[in-house]
Regions:
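Conserved catalytic cores and adjacent C-terminal regulatory segments
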Residues: 1-203
Length: 203
């Protein structure tokens, strides 16, 4: 049983519209409550085209594909959902974890047979980073960053050399991530301190 509210992002296959699959009821008039199991939500949010078939929920028969097609960095959705669930409450810690930067200059897209697919993947990764930058520039994100409660971690080198289906290269991903965390030591310490303060306050 899920104790705290959770959601994942998915995309309606028929309309290509982004949706949230929640573990709780939403009363927002423009949002739909989908009845699904955890494993169905997990399949829906990760049903990346070319790798997995679209996922259909057994209850509603709604069909979904990868949530990253629209919401590869759902930081704004997280903030909005939290404010809807707990009106007037403040934020103690927000940790946003990216999937790694992609350098489009290092990819010769014109020489690839699946040009459009690869370009889409690159755009998604770049948009994720742009969304993070946009968030810290707007009033909401700037306030949370200055208050020391918003932290963003996103491996900035090497991840773009590992394709989605290259599970054999997990050691490379580990190495790139460890190197990034070493370079980001001070920010990581601030994040840990913020989380520890939150845990101590609960006791």
């Amino acid at each position: 049983m899920l104790t705290f509210p959770r959601f994942v992002c998915a995309t309606r296959a028929q309309t290509v519209h982004p949706v949230l699959l929640r573990s709780y009821i939403t009363w927002q008039a423009t949002e739909e409550n989908y009845d699904c199991f955890i494993w169905e939500a997990a399949k829906a949010t990760s049903a990346a085209p070319l790798f997995f078939e679209p996922t259909q929920l057994r209850a509603s028969k709604a069909t979904f594909v990868d949530g990253a097609l629209h919401l590869n960095n759902p930081i704004s959705e997280v903030i909005n959902e939290a404010k809807s669930l707990w009106p007037g409450a403040g934020f103690k810690s927000i940790v946003s974890i990216g999937t790694g930067w992609i350098d489009p200059k290092g990819l010769e897209l014109s020489q690839l047979k699946i040009h459009n697919v690869v370009k889409t993947c690159v755009d998604l990764a770049i948009n994720s980073h742009k969304e993070a930058q946009k968030f810290v520039r707007d009033d909401r994100g700037k306030e949370l960053s200055q208050a020391g409660v918003y932290f963003r971690f996103d491996v900035d080198r090497g991840i773009d050399t590992v394709a989605l289906d290259q599970w054999q290269k997990l050691d490379d991903v580990d190495a790139f991530t460890e190197a990034y965390l070493t370079r980001s030591g001070s920010e990581l310490e601030r994040c840990a301190h913020s989380l520890c303060k939150e845990e101590t306050a609960r006791r």
